[in-house]
Amino acid sequence: MQTDCDVLIAGNGLAALTLALSLPESFRIVILCKNRLDDTASRHAQGGIAAAWSGEDDIEKHVADTLEAGAGLCNEAAVRTILSQGKPAIEWLLAQGVAFDRSHDGLHLTREGGHTCRRIAHVADYTGEAVMQSLIVQIRRRPNIRVYERQMALDIQTESGAACGLTVLDRRTQETYNIRASHTVLAGGGLGQIYAATTTPPECTGDAIAMAIRAGCAVENLEFIQFHPTGLARSSENGRTFLISEAVRGEGGILTNQAGERFMPHYDRRAELAPRDIVARAIAAEIAKQTQDFVSLDISHQPAAFVRRHFPSIHRHCLSQCGLDITRQAIPVRPVQHYTCGGIQTDPCGRTSLPQLYALGETACTGLHGANRLASNSLLECVVTARLCAQAIADGQAFQAEPFQRPSESLSAEAGIFSDDLQNTFSRPVLQTFNQRHLGILRNDTGLRRAIAQLQLWKQNQAEPHTASEYENRNLLECSLAVAQAAYRRRQNIGAHFNSDC
């Protein structure tokens, strides 16, 4: 097959750039950026990268914390494979020029919810930005890597039962074209923009996951949508809610309700350091009992210099955008969609059920996160799986996936139950608000069945897309329906999925 490149990567986040830099320099590599090279969800990551680094920690402890957070649904073999590469991943990032914070005896490690010890390597509270800046410098030094900006991947091209490239939309001209490749990699992030309130940037419209579904790839665990407990309860900017890092609670931040009472000890023995799903549901429960739509996160009992040193971007944002000085005042917070725990089914090397197609980062479901992601495991997964993927591609290793049976689109026969309530008019804000209500932290059978019926109707009535926005809407609908169906099929309350009728 004549190809335009050896490896075609749709996405420009941490996993995508790590893969490109880890492949042999003899490979012809193309990176498709939906917007600019430096515009990606990875850049907004605050917390850090979890790895068993210190003398008081070890891989077994990290594995145990990950399995507990994942609520029994992690793939333990994948967990061990990925976490065992934590220290080499940090060392690789150091070699790329990432200047992690230091203490007197080495890396400065912080602690976050669900972790039993300090193991989070970080750069203040803007780790993602620092990491991405370093990798972009390295990318621009590689003549074998071509970067195409403002290019949107639309669909997977196949030949003889294997992926052979992508159909792409040039967002500058709205023209489509094909790129053929020996290896195709989807690394376009999650589906956060199906919700009205999300920490993800506007580009996270589930493009890669939707493409994979249309191509018949195996996907799994899409019901497990992680809601971060502490999004800033102020107006969002550019469709993205500002995140208040897990590390604020890790460094002693206290959650209080409208009455000024600390409430987390009533919900979990780990209090503010419980896993994200537990803290998010607890905050939602407290908000339901009070008149204000937020709770307070207070770190002001720590020395002001400590707060400014550890959380400079949070301090700066709250002061400039909200007039809040977090060294003296509590931060108003509420849960916000943050991460897609499921995705395209892969092994730890990123290999999917479709030959020559790979998926990495939040797009993929390796089994590491199970029903709920442990804080700061996602950036680690990006680096480790991308490096393993590079090795698999270079070595020509094949992955024999289990046969995949696409779930039937059940409940379509019941759509008539809600016929009086369904809306024919579709818009992105309407979809996002609808999903926030029915596919949010707290779900129920009636809401999920109504969601499936409504989403199927919108999907059936959708016109053929021609513009970038229309293609994004197609993907948002595809992903929304997949989440709703997965949530309805899950008859157990576990991790990030909670159905009051189960």
Swiss-Prot record:
Gene coding for it: nadB
Cofactor requirements of the protein: FAD
EC identifiers of the protein: 1.4.3.16
Keywords: Cytoplasm, FAD, Flavoprotein, Nucleotide-binding, Oxidoreductase, Pyridine nucleotide biosynthesis
One Pfam entry name: FAD_binding_2
Co-factor binding comment: Binds 1 FAD per subunit.
Catalytic activity: L-aspartate + O2 = iminosuccinate + H2O2
Described purpose of this protein according to its UniProt entry: Catalyzes the oxidation of L-aspartate to iminoaspartate, the first step in the de novo biosynthesis of NAD(+).
The keyword Nucleotide-binding appears for this protein: yes
Pathway the protein acts in: Cofactor biosynthesis; NAD(+) biosynthesis; iminoaspartate from L-aspartate (oxidase route): step 1/1
Protein name: L-aspartate oxidase
Any single GO CC term annotated in Swiss-Prot or TrEMBL for this entry: cytoplasm
Cysteines engaged in disulfide bonds, as pairs: none
Example GO molecular function: nucleotide binding
Positions of FAD binding: 12-15, 34, 41-48, 207, 362, 378-379
Main location: cytoplasm
Record-annotated active site: 276 (proton donor/acceptor)
Similarity-based family: Belongs to the FAD-dependent oxidoreductase 2 family. NadB subfamily.
